[in-house]
């Protein structure tokens, strides 16, 4: 047990000098905080010529000075910089001359999003050097796709938003969901398999979509395996991962990046009303150009007529030519008008066929079919979850600490209930508790061997 260096203060009115106070404080801090882990953000980083590294570790409410001496700094693999979130290990010490305490560090590791951001930047640079982000690899999206594959979670707002956009803008487009997990380690292989399956089914385009989340939540879309699977697809892919401010490796590799899943759907959903307006505009432009052509020919004929010197046979020939041109122009105009009218009628019939009432009836039939399948799917899922739970319970029983104790091992606890991991944590004569598979023993430390002791396995 650590002896309190201030135990006598207040009893016999011992008066300390400032140096004595700081010296005792340093001993106390180094004994109590001899090896601790602390997490925070680096700021005020400096690297003097000595090779040591000094910085301030802070969070939203406090800060502490840190020193990483040259030998320890050489073991740090990550490039340290201001703003990096890190986990550090070291001891608390006090600089007696100023009375300031600081952390003397031996280990620095990136923490949280800091580590993920380093991995993101490294993979981005690697794939960029390989040319996976090059514009030459991008495939243009089809103007009027008829079959679209959606790679996303089957539940949640994302798939509902995409379906809503297509129902409003292009209800006749066939949508197929290739379900996959979109978060966690298992999502990586599922997304890769879904991309390969969708690419082989001959869709006009694919949407890879997921809602917003933290960098860790979206991390499966920053995996190299997913990026290479996207690059290997022949089918054009729109990446719609997260919110507008979220950027993933998938966005760089895909043919087009959409800020949201709804925006991805709008990129691929042709607007029926817009098509109707375009047909009307083309019709007006055609009529205007035909009228301009007819006017130019008439003016040309009038000019020729004025240049005629003898009205005889030449006049009759020009008159016949004019009649012929007039007939040809009228016939061409009528044919063109007929074609446009037929096309317009066809477009009107298509618009009629896409009436919301028909779509609603189709969706009601689909809803009824899904309602019949839902109870059976729920029962199957419950059965699978029960089997998984039983398997996990068996695994927990195998790795349980109590099972380890049951095989003859024990755990030594000090008087505060802390586990003893090495002999340096004990003192001769110290009372310890040995927890066994069944019951406990009170033991006393006779001696502590601070050097490793080799145990013979043959005795």
Curated annotation (Swiss-Prot):
Top EC class of this enzyme: hydrolase
One GO BP: DNA catabolic process
GO molecular function per UniProt: exodeoxyribonuclease VII activity; nucleic acid binding
Record flagged with keyword Hydrolase: yes
GO cellular component terms, A-Z: cytoplasm; exodeoxyribonuclease VII complex
Record's keyword annotation contains Nuclease: yes
Function recorded in the entry: Bidirectionally degrades single-stranded DNA into large acid-insoluble oligonucleotides, which are then degraded further into small acid-soluble oligonucleotides.
NCBIfam families according to UniProt: xseA (TIGR00237)
Name this polypeptide is given: Exodeoxyribonuclease 7 large subunit
Gene it is expressed from: xseA
């Amino acid at each position: 047990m650590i002896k309190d260096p201030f135990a006598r203060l207040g009893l016999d009115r011992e008066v300390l000098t400032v140096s004595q106070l700081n010296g005792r404080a340093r001993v106390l801090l180094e004994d109590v905080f001899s090896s601790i882990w602390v997490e925070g953000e680096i700021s005020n980083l400096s690297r003097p010529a000595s090779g040591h590294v000094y910085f301030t570790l802070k969070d939203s409410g406090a800060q502490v000075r840190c020193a990483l001496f040259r030998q320890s700094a050489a073991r740090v693999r990550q490039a340290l910089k201001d703003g990096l979130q890190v986990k550090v290990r070291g001891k608390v010490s006090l600089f007696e001359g100023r009375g300031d305490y600081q952390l003397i560090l031996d280990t620095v590791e990136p923490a949280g999003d800091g580590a993920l951001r380093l991995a993101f930047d490294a993979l981005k640079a690697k794939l960029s050097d390989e040319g996976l982000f090059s514009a030459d690899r991008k495939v243009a999206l089809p103007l009027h796709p008829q079959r679209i594959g959606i790679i996303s979670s089957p539940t949640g707002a994302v798939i509902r938003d995409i379906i809503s956009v297509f129902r409003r803008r292009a209800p006749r487009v066939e949508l197929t969901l290739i379900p996959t997990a979109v978060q966690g380690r298992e999502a990586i292989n599922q997304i890769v398999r879904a991309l390969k399956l969708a690419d082989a089914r001959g869709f006009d385009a694919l949407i890879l979509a997921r809602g917003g989340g933290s960098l860790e939540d979206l991390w499966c879309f920053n995996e190299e395996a997913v990026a290479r699977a996207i690059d290997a697809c022949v089918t054009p892919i729109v990446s719609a991962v997260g919110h507008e401010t979220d950027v993933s490796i998938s966005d760089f590799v895909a043919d087009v990046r959409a800020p949201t899943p709804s925006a991805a759907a709008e990129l691929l959903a042709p607007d029926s009303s817009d098509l109707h307006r375009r047909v009307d505009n083309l019709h007006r432009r055609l009529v205007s150009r035909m009228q301009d052509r007819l006017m130019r020919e008439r003016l040309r004929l009038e000019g020729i007529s004025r240049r005629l010197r003898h009205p005889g046979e030449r006049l009759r020939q020009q008159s016949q030519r004019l009649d012929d041109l007039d007939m040809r122009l009228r016939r061409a105009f009528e044919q063109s008008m007929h074609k446009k009218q037929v096309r317009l009628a066809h477009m009107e019939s298509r618009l009629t066929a896409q009436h919301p009432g028909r779509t609603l009836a189709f969706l009601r039939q689909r809803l009824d079919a899904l309602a019949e399948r839902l109870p059976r799917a729920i029962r199957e899922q419950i059965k699978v979850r029960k089997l998984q739970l039983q398997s996990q319970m068996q695994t927990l029983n195998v790795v349980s600490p109590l099972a380890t104790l049951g095989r003859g091992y024990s755990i030594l606890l000090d008087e505060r209930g802390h586990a003893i991991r090495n002999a340096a944590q004990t003192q001769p004569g110290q009372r310890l508790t040995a927890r066994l598979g069944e019951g406990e023993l009170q033991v006393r430390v006779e001696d502590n061997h601070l050097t490793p002791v080799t145990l013979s396995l043959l005795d």
